[in-house]
């Protein structure tokens, strides 16, 4: 069994008192309990808003303004919302176990109108674990949350896999989705459907018996049978159209003769005048064309002379302009020659200064070396003098010490002290604290050896210093050379840069050696380039004169072609006279041939008109008389085949009509006798029981019942056994099935379903195998589907039958036309077209005249061509020897390439000239740059340190030697030896002092002399540097001046400049000569143009006079042609055979037709006036207006629904074919379309019976409903007495009123209305038309009266009215009615929705406290039995044993209003479980 869909929960977001509240809805009854203002109505309003989000309907009564005249604009919704985004969402589970969340986003709109913006949406595929409040809120912290906007909600759901979010722009789409998913019971297609649904919800919400629903129960419970109404409307429309068409045919038949007469006479009248004007116009135009031809010839000659004048003037202007430019170029070439000469003189000065600078550079380098050597020697002298000074000072100090000792008493104590002092000094200097006089000698040897070692190391360092000083000087010299060439650079890069410079120097010298050969090569190429440019100029001038561009390869062939042209032009002059004579002879022959053809043309044109009519009618092209006769035989065969096919299609169409009539029977009975038998037996046709089966199930049930699908279901077979005896008026096989027609099912047979087939076990030994029919007709849907396909087939067959009938008659008329053509025109129709031959001959004649007229001009042109050819040959003779230069496309590139190479070579020469000496000096010393002698300073430091070490070692050795020498001072016995030792030492010191002073004197003298020499060398170096800098600056100035001149001063520059000047002088002379020639030719051309202008003026005067005469005579011709083409009558008026008649013959023809037309249009005022106006010979366009008026008059009288053209001539042809066929066909169609009144009555009666049975089934569900004193509720459906009488008359007494239904002036609806008025004269119909009343009578719902009755106490069955019932009884009765409506909607919508869906059922009840406990229990029982959900509200808790109860209390905390909610489950023992997040009634907890 299919589970019914349920509403799971209701969620309110940001409503007044509810920020984020979800109410879990019970499967049966959910109760909202609370005092006034607790939020019960707000909760229900949120549910209703989500269910029906239509602001035009929503109106919550408890906010209606008392005493207001127009009601509240708010309608109760604006005040229930908080500012910002609000939501109301319904969480549902449908029969397919799909979770669907539907809801609306609400937002207050700022303004006085207190409007609310509503956006419906739906969410599918949401997991069960996700709560609705989680979707639309975002938690900010433990106590704060934020409501998401609709866009944020969509983005959030898009991130969830499998979840679909849909936003709806219309309420219809929103409700359509809810219907398809089983949330609502009825498809709400329109605002009217939504209004019905809202009224039902509103009636449920506020309780009681709703008068709005009870008054219109027919609309709520009875479905509209739109198919029947549409069928009647289509039938009446078809009948009306047929009658109108038949009437039009009759009118058209009377107009046929008038059409023929008017068309024939009007055509002769207008066409004769039209062709006469056309002939006259052609004659006048030929004369005007002759004048215009001469005029154009003269203009062409004048234009040629003007073109020639313009060309010569342009060429003269070019030469004038070229002369100015050539003069400027010549002056520029002269100036350039002067600049080259100046540059050459400047170059000579530069070369002299460069030689002087090179000599100064050598002397400067030599002087630098001398100064450097003198500076080194000066440093050595200074060092030597400083050393001598130090030695003298030391010796003087020592000598002073000994002298002081000698001045004191030579006592032992002094000596002893001196010895002790010497020993202490030795210990200090030698760092020997343990030194004793006894060990001093040993230590003296050691320190003397150390002194010797230090002296040797010092000598070695002196040698290294000398070598390093030399290397340092060489490195600095090489580094300075590299820096001078390359510029500033790091010392570490000197080696790599030096090698690169040396390699580059080799390349630069190599390039510098190529300067002179390159200059010679460049001079040669520049000469060839100038020759090439001259050749290009000659070629451009030649192409300009020839008016065409030529390739170089084409010049030789062109030369030969021009020579051949010269030869041919000379030959063509001799043949000119013979050609002229031949052309004149041919012209005379053409004239005689044209006259003969013009006599034969009218006969041939008449035959062609007839042949073209035949071709248009049959769609074939005929090229011979044999084809015409063969096609006539084919027509006879085609006519026989068409007649046979027409009869076959007609038979098939009749069969389809019969099948449609059989399937259209009410109840699905294919045999009318079955309906009568069903009424006789008190049964129902099986097809009527299954009338509502869907199209998908129709094949199954058709195969299930097989041949018994047309059986009659009767309550008891035993009761009809006697009636079967003697039964003859019945089908051959009559099937009877016992069963209750009101609750019949398919359990009659044991059946096994196979693939597209069933096996029915009729008995133990009898099975029936039936396949599903491909075209089932079981059930109304299947029959309607089959009828629809049959109607489509019938339309095709009808169209085919009409086409074949038309073809048959058309073929017969075509056969007659062919017979007439063969008898009259077959002999001449297939001859050659004489007009085409005339046109061809006229064209040839015009060509001959043109050839004769242009013969003389051809000779002149040939002479001009001869001169041009000779001039071209002369130019080519100058060009051909230079073709090789023109073909050399790389010459300019090679000049540029050589120029670039020469620039590079000159740059290399300048580099070698500037840095050659430095590179030569750098090459032998470049190897010293490999290692940077920057260690020279370190070596100097090492030398100073070694010198200090040697000095220290010497002092230590001297101190030890003094101790050793003073060993005697330590002994008192050695004083004499000590004095003698002191005397010797003093003498040695004096000798050394004298030597040192002498050495110092010599060093000082050498230092002074060498300093003077160094100063002299430095002065010479400064003088050389000053001279070098001065000459270098002068050289730079000269080079800048040379660069400013901007001329390359080489050996051939002067010669090239002079040659260029001479060439320009020659061009200037040639240009002046050509200019003089053009001025003379231009004067001659102007004189010729003046003569032609005078001639042209005379021709223009003659031509304009003739043209003015043509225009004056034919002023209206353009209007005539425009009118003819705009109205499309040119084909009718331009009759070519009339072109060969004379003007008098055409006038006579037109006058005869005019007389006939006056009689024909005497009764038509409009045509008579137009004809009178057309008789004016000066206004030919009025005749066209008359012809158009005749055609328009006839066209307006053509019925477009009958005749398939707007051309009256073609209409006459179609009339002959269509009239009889359409008359017969439409008459038969009207008879078939007409429906009998008995059938109408049967259809309406069967429909009423079916709906009564359905209401009876609905009443069964309400038998046990009781509220208070009300024991039961039922719905009565009765047929109105007046309408029942109408049905009886239609089915039994229709013969008495055939005057209504057989009238051609009344439609069936109007006849039905007239019958109703005839039967009920006492009823006032008001202002309604019979058509409107008849359409209402075709709706079965207008035949029924419906009312609700209750069985109350001792009163029995009473009509349910609010005044007769208590409040609780009215609420219960109203709820019962609403349940019946909902169930009816579900039954009605079952065919529109999937069979696997059972929709949700939910109703509301506000103020439910007015019901007693028994009524509440009845409601619970009703909800459980009908699987319906109910939401009720009461000020007090009614404490039901079943369902869910929410206790609502509105509180205010810190100026914030919220509703406190406690949820309770029913306390019945069978439902012990609690709500999620709540507790049992004994321990209630607050619902979050």
From Swiss-Prot:
It is found in: Cytoplasm, Nucleoid. One of its GO terms (molecular function) is DNA binding. Residues 1049-1074 are annotated as: Disordered. Residues 326-418, 444-472, 509-602, 835-923, 977-1116, 1209-1265 form a coiled coil. GO terms for cellular component: cytoplasm; nucleoid. Keywords: ATP-binding, Cell cycle, Cell division, Chromosome partition, Coiled coil, Cytoplasm, DNA condensation, DNA-binding, Nucleotide-binding. GO terms for biological process: cell division; chromosome condensation; chromosome segregation; DNA replication. Residues 1051-1065 have a biased composition (Basic and acidic residues). The keyword Kinase does not apply. Pfam families: MukB, MukB_hinge, SbcC_Walker_B. It comes from the Bacteria. Residues 666-783 are annotated as: Flexible hinge. ATP binds at residues 34-41. Its main location: cytoplasm. Homodimerization via its hinge domain. Binds to DNA via its C-terminal region. Interacts, and probably forms a ternary complex, with MukE and MukF via its C-terminal region. The complex formation is stimulated by calcium or magnesium. Interacts with tubulin-related protein FtsZ. The hinge domain, which separates the large intramolecular coiled coil regions, allows the homodimerization, forming a V-shaped homodimer. Plays a central role in chromosome condensation, segregation and cell cycle progression. Functions as a homodimer, which is essential for chromosome partition. Involved in negative DNA supercoiling in vivo, and by this means organize and compact chromosomes. May achieve or facilitate chromosome segregation by condensation DNA from both sides of a centrally located replisome during cell division. Belongs to the SMC family. MukB subfamily. This is Chromosome partition protein MukB. It comes from Salmonella typhimurium (strain LT2 / SGSC1412 / ATCC 700720). The gene is mukB.
């Amino acid at each position: 069994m299919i589970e019914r869909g349920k509403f799971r929960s209701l969620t309110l977001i940001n409503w007044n008192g509810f920020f984020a509240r979800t109410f879990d809805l019970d499967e049966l009854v959910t109760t909202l309990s609370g005092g006034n203002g607790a939020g019960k109505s707000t909760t229900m309003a949120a549910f209703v808003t989500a269910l029906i989000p239509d602001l035009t309907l929503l109106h919550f009564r408890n906010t209606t303004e008392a005493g207001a005249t127009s009601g509240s604009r708010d309608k109760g919704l604006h005040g229930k919302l908080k500012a910002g985004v609000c939501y109301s969402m319904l969480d549902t589970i449908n029969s397919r176990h799909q979770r669907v969340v539907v809801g609306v986003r609400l937002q207050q709109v700022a303004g006085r109108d207190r409007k609310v913006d509503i956006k419906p949406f739906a969410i599918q595929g949401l997991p069960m674990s996700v709560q609705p409040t989680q979707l639309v809120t975002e938690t900010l912290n433990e106590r704060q949350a934020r409501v998401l906007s609709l866009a944020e909600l969509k983005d959030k759901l898009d991130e969830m896999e499998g979840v679909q979010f849909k936003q709806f722009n219309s309420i219809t789409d929103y409700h359509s989705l809810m219907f398809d998913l089983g949330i609502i019971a009825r498809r709400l297609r329109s605002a009217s459907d939504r209004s019905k649904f809202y009224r039902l919800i509103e009636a449920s919400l506020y309780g009681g018996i709703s008068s709005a629903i009870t008054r219109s129960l027919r609309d709520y419970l009875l479905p509209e049978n739109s198919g029947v109404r549409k069928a009647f409307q289509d039938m009446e429309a078809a009948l009306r159209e047929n009658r109108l068409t038949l009437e039009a045919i009759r009118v058209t038949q009377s107009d046929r003769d008038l059409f023929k007469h008017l068309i024939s006479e009007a055509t002769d009248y207008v066409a004769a005048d039209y062709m006469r004007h056309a002939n006259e116009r052609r004659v006048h135009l030929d004369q005007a064309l002759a004048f215009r031809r001469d005029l154009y010839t003269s203009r062409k000659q004048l234009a040629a002379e003007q073109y020639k004048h313009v060309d010569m003037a342009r060429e003269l202007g070019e030469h004038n302009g070229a002369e100015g430019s050539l003069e400027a170029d010549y002056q520029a070439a002269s100036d350039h020659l002067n600049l080259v000469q100046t540059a050459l003189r400047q170059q000579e000065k530069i070369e002299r200064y460069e030689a002087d600078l090179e000599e100064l550079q050598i002397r400067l380098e030599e002087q630098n070396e001398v100064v450097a050597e003198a500076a080194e020697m000066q440093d050595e002298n200074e060092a030597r003098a400083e050393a001598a000074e130090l030695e003298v000072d030391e010796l003087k100090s020592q000598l002073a010490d000994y002298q002081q000792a000698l001045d004191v008493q030579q006592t032992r104590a002094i000596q002893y002290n001196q010895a002790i002092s010497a020993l202490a000094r030795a210990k200090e200097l030698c760092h020997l604290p343990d030194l004793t006089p006894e060990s001093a000698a040993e230590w003296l040897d050691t320190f003397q050896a150390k002194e010797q070692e230090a002296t040797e190391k010092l000598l070695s360092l002196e040698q290294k210093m000398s070598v390093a000083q030399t290397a340092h000087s060489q490195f600095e010299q090489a580094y300075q050379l590299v820096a001078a060439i390359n510029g500033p650079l790091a010392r570490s890069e000197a080696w790599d840069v030096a090698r690169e410079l040396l390699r580059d120097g080799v390349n630069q010298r190599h390039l510098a050696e190529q300067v002179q050969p390159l200059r010679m090569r460049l001079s040669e190429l520049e000469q060839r380039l100038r020759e090439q440019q001259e050749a290009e100029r000659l070629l451009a001038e030649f192409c300009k004169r020839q008016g065409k561009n030529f390739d170089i390869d084409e010049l030789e062939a062109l030369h030969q072609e021009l020579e051949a042209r010269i030869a041919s032009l000379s030959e063509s002059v001799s043949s000119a006279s013979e050609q002229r004579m031949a052309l004149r002879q041919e012209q005379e022959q053409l004239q005689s041939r044209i006259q003969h053809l013009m006599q034969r043309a009218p006969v041939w044109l008449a035959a062609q008109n007839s042949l073209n009519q035949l071709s248009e009618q049959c769609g074939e092209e005929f090229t011979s008389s044999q084809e015409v006769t063969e096609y006539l035989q084919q027509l006879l065969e085609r006519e026989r085949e068409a007649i046979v096919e027409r009869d076959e299609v007609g038979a098939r169409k009749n069969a389809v009509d019969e099948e449609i009539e059989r399937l259209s029977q009410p109840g699905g009975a294919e045999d009318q006798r079955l309906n009568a038998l069903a009424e006789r037996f008190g049964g129902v046709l099986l097809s009527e029981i299954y009338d509502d089966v869907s199209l998908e199930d129709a094949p199954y049930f058709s195969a299930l019942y097989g041949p018994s699908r047309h059986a009659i279901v009767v309550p008891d077979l035993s009761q009809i056994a006697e009636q079967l005896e003697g039964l003859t008026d019945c089908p051959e096989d009559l099937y009877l099935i016992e069963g209750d027609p009101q609750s019949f099912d398919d359990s009659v047979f044991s059946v096994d379903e196979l693939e597209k087939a069933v096996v029915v076990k009729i008995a133990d030994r009898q099975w029936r195998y039936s396949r599903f029919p491909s075209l089932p007709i079981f059930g109304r849907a299947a029959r309607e589907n089959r009828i629809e396909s049959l109607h489509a087939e019938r339309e095709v067959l009808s169209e085919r039958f009409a086409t074949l009938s038309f073809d048959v008659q058309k073929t017969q008329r075509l056969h007659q036309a062919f017979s007439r053509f063969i008898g009259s025109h077959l002999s001449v129709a297939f001859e050659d077209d004489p007009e085409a031959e005339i046109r061809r001959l006229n064209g040839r004649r015009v060509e001959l005249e043109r050839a004769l007229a242009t013969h003389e001009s051809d000779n002149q042109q040939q002479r001009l061509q001869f001169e041009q050819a000779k001039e071209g040959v002369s130019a080519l003779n100058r060009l051909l020897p230079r073709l090789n230069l023109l073909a050399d496309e790389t010459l300019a590139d090679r000049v540029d390439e050589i120029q670039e190479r020469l620039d590079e070579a000159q740059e290399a020469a300048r580099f070698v000239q500037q840095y050659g000496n430095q590179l030569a000096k750098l090459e032998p010393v470049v190897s010293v740059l490999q290692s940077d002698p920057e260690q020279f300073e370190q070596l100097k430091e090492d030398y100073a340190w070694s010198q200090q070490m040697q000095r220290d070692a010497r002092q230590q050795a001297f101190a030890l030697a003094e101790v050793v020498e003073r060993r005697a001072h330590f002994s008192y016995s050695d004083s004499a030896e000590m004095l003698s030792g002191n005397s010797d030492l003093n003498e040695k010191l004096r000798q050394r002092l004298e030597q040192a002073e002498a050495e110092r004197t010599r060093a000082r003298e050498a230092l002074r002399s060498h300093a003077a020499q160094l100063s002299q060398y430095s002065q010479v170096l400064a003088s050389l540097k000053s001279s070098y800098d001065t000459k270098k600056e002068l050289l730079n100035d000269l080079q800048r001046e040379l660069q400013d001149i901007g001329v390359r001063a080489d050996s051939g520059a002067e010669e090239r400049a002079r040659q260029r000047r001479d060439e320009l002088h020659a061009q200037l002379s040639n240009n002046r000569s050509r200019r003089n020639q053009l001025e003379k030719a231009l004067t001659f051309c102007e004189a010729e143009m003046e003569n032609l202008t005078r001639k042209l003026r005379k021709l223009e005067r003659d031509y304009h006079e003739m043209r003015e005469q043509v225009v004056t005579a034919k002023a209206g011709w353009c209007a005539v042609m425009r009118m003819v083409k705009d109205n499309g009558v040119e084909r009718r008026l331009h009759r070519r055979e009339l072109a060969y008649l004379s003007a008098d013959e055409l006038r006579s023809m037109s006058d005869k037709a005019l007389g006939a037309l006056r009689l024909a249009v005497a009764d038509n005022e409009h045509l008579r006036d137009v004809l009178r106006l057309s008789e004016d010979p000066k206004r030919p366009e009025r005749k066209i207006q008359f012809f158009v008026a005749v055609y328009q008059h006839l066209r307006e009288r053509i019925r477009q629904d009958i005749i398939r053209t707007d051309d009256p001539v073609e209409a006459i042809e179609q009339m002959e074919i269509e009239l009889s066929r359409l008359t017969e066909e439409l008459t038969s169609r009207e008879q078939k379309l007409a429906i009998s009144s008995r059938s109408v009555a049967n259809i309406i009666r069967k429909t009423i019976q079916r709906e009564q049975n359905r209401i009876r089934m609905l009443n069964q569900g309400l038998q046990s409903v009781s509220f208070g004193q009300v024991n039961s509720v039922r719905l009565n459906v009765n047929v109105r007495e007046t309408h029942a009488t109408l049905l009886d008359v239609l089915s039994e007494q229709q013969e008495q009123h055939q005057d209504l239904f057989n009238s051609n002036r009344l439609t069936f609806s109007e006849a039905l209305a007239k019958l109703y008025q005839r039967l009920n004269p006492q009823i006032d119909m008001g202002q309604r038309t019979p058509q409107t009343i008849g359409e209402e009578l075709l709706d079965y719902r207008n035949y029924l009266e419906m009312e609700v009755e209750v069985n109350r106490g001792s009163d029995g069955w009473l009509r349910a009215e609010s005044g007769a019932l208590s409040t609780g009884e009215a609420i219960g009765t109203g709820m019962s009615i609403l349940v019946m409506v909902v169930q009816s909607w579900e039954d009605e919508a079952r065919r529109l929705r999937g069979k696997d869906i059972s929709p949700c059922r939910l109703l509301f009840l506000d103020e439910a406290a007015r019901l007693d406990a028994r009524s509440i229990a009845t409601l619970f029982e009703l909800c459980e039995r009908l699987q319906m959900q109910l939401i009720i509200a009461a000020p007090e808790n009614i404490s039901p044993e079943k369902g869910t109860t929410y206790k609502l209390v509105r509180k205010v905390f810190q100026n914030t209003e919220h509703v406190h909610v406690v949820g309770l489950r029913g306390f019945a023992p069978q439902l012990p479980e609690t709500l999620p997040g709540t507790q049992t009634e004994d321990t209630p907890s607050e619902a979050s």
